[in-house]
Amino acid sequence: PSNPIVSVGTILAVPGVRAAIEASAAPVVAVSPIVGGAAIKGPAAPMLTALGYEVSARGVAQCYAGLIDALVIDQVDAALADDIRAMGIEVVVTDTIMRGPAEKRALAQAALDAARQVAA
């Protein structure tokens, strides 16, 4: 789960990158870096606020609207899933906090499963 503003946003700002992703037939999946209304780490929360987005998985979905096909969100934020789906974004709810290798593998698998789901 990367900061959608400074990590992913800077990559998307490279000329042609966003357009290439939007034009691709490949499924695009993001993992929300916001859990329970707070950033997992780093400055994502104040940056989302500064740009007018809610500090939530829903705000992350709004930030990525039109770009992603699916968003992996934490179980804590499961109540937001229907709001995100209403934006046309598929949602996978799982534990997104990576405490060790097993959790990292499980989150990666959830993202892959989301990609397969939207590609089907």
PLM region spans:
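Hydrophobic, aromatic-enriched interface-forming segments
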Residues: 1-2
